[in-house]
């Protein structure tokens, strides 16, 4: 029998429901249970694919090509369970499905309403595709009291009643602010949040209280009294130095024990947290430090590059070093003298992005790395900019550019040729300039073949790989021979000969990839490209 755990949040947003869900999933796994995590997002977008990174943060892409919330990245990094399209639903998708059913006549002339039609659609999502999981953890986005979240809260209330309290647990994450002038943690915001949730028919069974210090026993009992919860089920979610310390911290607070006790499951014995204690030890006691410059467009909101930052941390864990990230807006390098800021970094990474703003700065960063022999890692747009730089300054194609940015004389990157169609499984995908923007990129996992003896083949330890993609433009294979003659190697190609990886053999470490390797990296299984990149940065640190 599958059991369901619903995680809601109150008081303020950004308390860490996604991390809390991921950490609980990891703890249940460590006790031998099989888990899956899902996210209900209350916005009206069908998916976050067309949302600004400044508003939403990164878009996390799954193997099956879904553009999803960044919390699914936390789920996958903590549990190792590959996320899928069905693990993230939005209000927009729910309403689209309901309206499509109404147009087909599925409701047989009924007046279509939020209750029961929208809530039924949400419940169908929660219960869909369950196989042999012991637990389904379902995070509800937003904060209790938000208008947008109301249908989701009503749906999980109904769902809990339908499966019975023995199979449904409601966890509420709140904030316990410390007021220095009073010298104490204040419980009133938590009390009001629980009351708001109760007004929607949901009694929280466990309270997870975010705090910067331990909760005194008298305060714990006070919360329990006013929130109608047992004192032992008021759990402190303490601030920690590393997010990978959260599972260990939660276990020490008894979180997983109380979850199992609620369901009447055995609580004896300890979970195997050795992988987490080992990771935390490496994070706390690194043997050195390297500085990586991340030259991007959205550096004022670091959530735009959440998986990337974590993957670099994973590379540091694998090499037992601390990775210090220097976030640089690529626009500053459009002033040629500003590139000197890169003089003392040990590696340069140019991540993905869209549009023309800051592109010349990215090209200049790639040029600096190539000419100064600094390790360079270009991801998606960062690979394309590196190829344009090589075309201009190595092959002499001075008007090389991308059709994404205008109409260059030589479209080294563009929506053209092979990039207008490709195979996905047994179906042919086609794109044109007039295709809708949402959900039409090359998305999800695709295979590639690596050149034997190349740097990337050495890094991967194989010549056959699969990686996740999210892009609309591609390096134009027409220029392949011309660029290879001047020292750029196309070391990875798709089965239909789309360029996937480029490298410069005559360079300590210069690799560009069209895909997003950061999406598959985990703290206990770092992606080989990030491990190798940080290793190269360590070597560079000895030269600077």
Curated annotation (Swiss-Prot):
SUPFAM superfamilies hit by this protein: Class I glutamine amidotransferase-like, P-loop containing nucleoside triphosphate hydrolases
Residues annotated as the enzyme's active site: 380, 516, 518
Assigned EC number: 6.3.4.2
Presence of keyword Nucleotide-binding: yes
Positions contributing to ATP binding: 14-19, 71, 240
Domain of life per record: Bacteria
Binding site for UTP: 13, 186-191, 222
Keywords: ATP-binding, Glutamine amidotransferase, Ligase, Magnesium, Metal-binding, Nucleotide-binding, Pyrimidine biosynthesis
InterPro entries referenced in this protein's UniProt entry, alphabetically: Class_I_gatase-like (IPR029062), CTP_synthase (IPR004468), CTP_synthase_N (IPR017456), GATASE (IPR017926), GATase1_CTP_Synthase (IPR033828), P-loop_NTPase (IPR027417)
Region (Amidoligase domain): 1-265
Enzyme class name: ligase
Residues that bind Mg(2+): 71, 139
Keyword Cytoplasm on entry: no
Pathway: Pyrimidine metabolism; CTP biosynthesis via de novo pathway; CTP from UDP: step 2/2
UniProt domain Glutamine amidotransferase type-1: residue ranges: 291-543
NCBIfam families, per database record: PRK05380.1 (NF003792), PyrG (TIGR00337)
Misc. comment: CTPSs have evolved a hybrid strategy for distinguishing between UTP and CTP. The overlapping regions of the product feedback inhibitory and substrate sites recognize a common feature in both compounds, the triphosphate moiety. To differentiate isosteric substrate and product pyrimidine rings, an additional pocket far from the expected kinase/ligase catalytic site, specifically recognizes the cytosine and ribose portions of the product inhibitor.
Record's protein name: CTP synthase
Species annotation: Azospirillum brasilense
Gene it is expressed from: pyrG
């Amino acid at each position: 029998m599958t059991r369901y755990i619903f995680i809601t949040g109150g008081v303020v947003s950004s308390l860490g429901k996604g991390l809390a869900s991921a950490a609980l999933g990891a703890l249940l796994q460590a006790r031998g249970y099989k888990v899956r995590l899902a996210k209900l997002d209350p916005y009206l977008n069908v998916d976050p694919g067309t949302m600004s990174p400044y508003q939403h943060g990164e878009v996390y892409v799954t193997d099956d090509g879904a553009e999803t919330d960044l919390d699914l990245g936390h789920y996958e990094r903590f549990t190792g369970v590959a996320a899928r399209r069905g693990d993230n639903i939005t209000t927009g998708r729910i309403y689209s499905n309901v309206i499509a059913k109404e147009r087909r006549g599925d409701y047989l002339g009924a007046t279509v309403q939020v209750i029961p039609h929208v809530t039924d659609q949400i419940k169908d999502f929660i219960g869909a595709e369950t196989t042999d999981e012991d637990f389904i953890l379902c995070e509800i986005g937003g904060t209790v009291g938000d208008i947008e979240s109301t249908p989701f809260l009503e749906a999980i209330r109904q769902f809990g009643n339908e499966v019975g309290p023995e199979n449904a647990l409601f966890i509420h994450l709140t904030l316990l602010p410390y007021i220095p002038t009073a010298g104490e943690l204040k419980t009133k915001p938590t009390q009001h949040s629980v009351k708001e949730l109760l007004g929607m028919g949901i009694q929280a069974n466990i309270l997870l209280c975010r705090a910067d210090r331990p909760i005194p026993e008298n305060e714990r009992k006070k919360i329990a009294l006013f929130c109608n919860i047992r004192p032992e089920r008021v759990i402190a979610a303490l601030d920690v130095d590393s997010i990978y310390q959260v599972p260990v911290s939660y276990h020490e607070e008894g979180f997983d024990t109380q979850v199992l006790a609620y369901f009447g499951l055995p609580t004896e014995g300890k979970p195997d947290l050795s992988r987490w204690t080992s990771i935390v030890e490496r994070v706390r006691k690194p043997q050195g430090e390297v500085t990586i410059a991340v030259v991007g467009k959205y550096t004022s909101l670091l959530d735009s590059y959440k998986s990337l930052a974590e993957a670099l941390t994973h590379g540091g864990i694998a090499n037992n070093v601390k990775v210090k990230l220097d976030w640089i807006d690529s626009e500053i390098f459009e002033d040629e003298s500003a590139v000197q800021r890169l003089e003392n970094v040990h590696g340069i990474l140019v991540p993905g992005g869209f549009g023309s703003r800051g592109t010349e700065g990215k090209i200049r960063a790639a040029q600096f790395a190539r000419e100064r022999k600094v390790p360079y890692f270009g991801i998606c747009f960062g690979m394309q900019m590196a190829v344009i730089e090589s075309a201009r300054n190595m092959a002499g194609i001075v008007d090389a550019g991308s059709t994404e940015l205008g109409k260059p004389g030589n479209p080294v990157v563009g929506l053209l040729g092979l990039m207008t169609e490709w195979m996905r499984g047994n179906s042919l995908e086609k794109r044109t300039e007039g295709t809708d923007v949402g959900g039409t990129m090359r998305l999800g996992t695709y295979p590639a073949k690596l050149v034997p003896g190349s740097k990337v083949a050495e890094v991967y330890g194989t010549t056959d790989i699969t990686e996740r993609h999210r892009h609309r433009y591609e390096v134009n294979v027409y220029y392949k021979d011309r660029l290879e003659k001047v020292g750029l190697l196309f070391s990875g190609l798709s089965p239909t000969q789309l360029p996937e990886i480029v490298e410069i053999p005559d360079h300590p470490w210069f690799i560009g990839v069209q895909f997003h390797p950061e999406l598959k990296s985990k703290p206990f299984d770092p992606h080989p490209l990030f491990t190798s990149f940080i290793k190269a940065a360590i070597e560079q640190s000895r030269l600077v």
